[in-house]
Regions:
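Nucleotide and nucleotide-moiety/phosphate-recognizing core
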Residues: 2-124, 134-148, 155-161, 168, ...
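Hydrophobic alpha-helical segments within soluble ligand-binding/sensing domains
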Residues: 128-132
Length: 206
């Protein structure tokens, strides 16, 4: 019995060597963008890196990255430094380098259609007007990659300039609403890596 247990553990280890995920948080580099709505993906990735004790400090393919293991999954964390609209120029070559298929590329980004702190988990889909997602879709060659969109709140009125809104800083109450959801975001990311995206949706969407 012990022999079979050892063999099974070795087999599981071999299988897990091919289980690798790229998790990318979207945002803009430069300190002046810290704390802005459009950098919600960067902030969420930093929260995961802290929780998982993964240092995101190496540079490759126009991005800051680090790697580790989370619940048996190999994980590469990435913050593209290309600016938002060219996020795919960092994500696609990083995925290619590690031979990570698109359905194992999990993207964290902001969502102006959701209230601050709301999460929207999707297995695939269009860019929905998000230029970062648009770039990733173009560079990966399709829409079939999961994403967790983080609510940042809608413009206060239709005439408000969109760029000014997403590049504006969060008020403290909105920043807290988002930070309070980081435990849910982490749990959702783990479920997605476990192949349980539908469960992540039912538990954490909204």
């Amino acid at each position: 019995m012990l022999y079979h247990t050892i063999i099974r553990k070795r087999y599981d280890h071999i299988m897990n060597e091919n289980d690798i995920w790229l998790i990318a948080g979207l945002g803009n580099p430069e300190a002046k963008y810290d704390g802005t709505r459009h950098n919600a993906g960067f902030a969420a990735l930093d929260a995961l890196a802290d929780k998982w004790n993964i240092s995101v400090g190496k540079t490759k393919f126009q991005g800051l990255w680090g790697q580790g293991e989370v619940d048996g999954h190999k994980v590469v964390l990435l913050k593209p430094l290309t600016y938002m609209n060219l996020s795919g120029d960092s994500i696609a070559p990083m995925a290619g380098f590690f031979k990570i298929p698109a359905d194992h590329v999990l993207v964290l980004c902001d969502d102006i259609t959701q209230a601050p702190g709301k999460l929207r988990i999707r297995p695939s889909g269009s860019a929905g007007g998000h230029n970062g997602l648009k770039s990733i879709i173009a560079r990966l060659g399709g829409e079939n990659f999961p994403r967790i969109r983080i609510g940042i709140g809608a413009k206060p009125h239709p005439d408000y300039d969109l760029a000014a809104w997403v590049l504006g800083k969060f008020p403290p109450e909105d920043a807290k609403a988002i930070a309070d959801r980081y435990p849910d975001l982490e749990a959702a990311a783990k479920l997605i890596m476990d192949g349980k995206l539908s469960l992540a949706q039912s538990k954490y969407n909204g």
